[in-house]
Amino acid sequence: MSPEGSAALETLMRDPAPLPVQFEPMTNESGLGFLLRASRANGVSFASLLDELGLPRSPWLTAAGLSVLAYTINVDRDWLAFATVIPGRRDGFRCFEWRGRLWTCPLSLRGKYPQVCPRCLREGGACLLDWELAGAVACLQHGCPLIDGCPHCGRRLTWLRPAVDVCNCGHYLWVDSTAQTREAMGAWVGRLVGNASGSGTPGTTSTYMLPPWFNVLSADALTAIAFSFGVRDGPFERVTSAAATVPPSTRRMTSIIERALIRLRRAHDLAVPCPSDLRLCVYEQALWRLWRRHADLSDRDAAARILLWLGARSGKNCASISAPGSDQCELFALLGGDE
């Protein structure tokens, strides 16, 4: 730590007051990214700041931790809570709060391990809020893949690194300038980001056709559906508990989404019978979990319709899936059902 950083921490210990260098979060900036950037601007590491405040070295912040950090960094606490992934429980199941809503799919948000676009960091200097979406594996601005590991040492990135664009090994982060994502992936990320932000519009002008019913679902549901369609390389491949509950690496998630998009092109119209070879590749448990745990009725109805289309091979009783209510008829029609 620099001498200036040591002095700042000593001051904080003697007189718990906001750090001297203060600034506002950038547009669409991640909460943890802002804390990392603000700590750096004050000459201390984020890890050291957590230590001196008596908080655990963890990106999972409690309500008390949020309040202490918001006061110390002098940022609005409500904004920090909005822009930070906060774990919790609902009906006995783990869930997350982020962007003012509840997320029930355990694979939707990165949380503990960040992913970044080094080109954005070099140009703008801030970690974006959208990068918290585990399925947002590409940068819409530069058309390149995001990274979650250091290209120099190979270690996974953490929120406790020295700066937003520097790994714990001390090297700056970078990405191959020739690496480009496919049109289909750009369309997917655009839709995911648009639905997560509530804008209802994709962040890309791609003409790639996604299933029309993607437009009305939450980003949480889109991630669960993509995982169910893409996690298996082939029919009946075993999916471990860890694979179904822990967000995969960015590279692994990219492969999952690429397979899912290929298979989902055959699911544009769910009124057409499901191909038998496709049915064998879908991991239905993720859809059942979405149907049982999600609070959003549109998302639950979508999961139910897909399960009915697949024939619900898992032995569960398809009759237990209720038909949509009158306010979900438009969605059900989009999915190929009868009103």
Identify the function of each model-found stretch:
Residues 1-339:
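Basic, alpha-helical nucleic-acid-binding regions used in initiation and control of genome expression
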